């Protein structure tokens, strides 16, 4: 079972498809005028399913700031999760997808032939809607990606695992039970374990796709508190269906509607002084 998980993990971290990223297109490797206060700059991005027959994103242009929490809001099917997956090329796990445009991460074009998918997925970690602990011990869950990178030294592993679990506000709850199976943890603990597993690789960015949607209010509160602490070290980009959550935790908010960015800016401005009618209608519950 462990070997099978390792093979799947390696495939997940490094896999690409020939059609999805359209790497035959000539792209600029670097963006010379990249703003150092940003972590991502996205330019003229369009994304398609079904070999171009179904367009999911339209002409997306967006700058995402470093060490901020940026929330993506909008109705179901508006493109926010699709866009999130593009930021670490997870879209390439889906067949028959294609896109045009550019995504720059720390000046580099992530779809350039020179950019390593493995390096990107280490630097831009992902936490999914449903907690995904591996069926192994708590310790081995956090150690898994480290060992996959070739780290075998027990002292380094122990130190990194403790640091990661502390950063995920989980250490005090599990420090005496590190050999227990991870799937026996509560839902909220499992999600924090997945966050610990992601930050063990020392990423710059954490992508979170509705990380609290399956959790109770108490577990949700703990995750939100954790996000506020983590933004001191990481850039966090979160998809949420909860406008209240976006207001509580995010510095910047991006409103998607029918595959387009309608409005983005400081969260207070989006919710208190929206410029666009569609934004006002969504926030006030008139569209959804």
Curated annotation (Swiss-Prot):
GO terms for biological process: phosphate ion transmembrane transport. InterPro entries: AAA+_ATPase, ABC_transporter-like_ATP-bd, ABC_transporter-like_CS, P-loop_NTPase, PstB-like. It is found in: Cell membrane. It is a peripheral membrane protein. It is an enzyme of class 7 (translocase). GO terms for molecular function: ATP binding; ATP hydrolysis activity; ATPase-coupled phosphate ion transmembrane transporter activity. It comes from the Bacteria. Its EC number is 7.3.2.1. It catalyses: phosphate(out) + ATP + H2O = ADP + 2 phosphate(in) + H(+). Signal peptide: none annotated. It holds the Pfam family ABC_tran. This is Phosphate import ATP-binding protein PstB. It comes from Malacoplasma penetrans (strain HF-2) (Mycoplasma penetrans). The lineage of its organism: Bacteria, Bacillati, Mycoplasmatota, Mycoplasmoidales, Mycoplasmoidaceae.
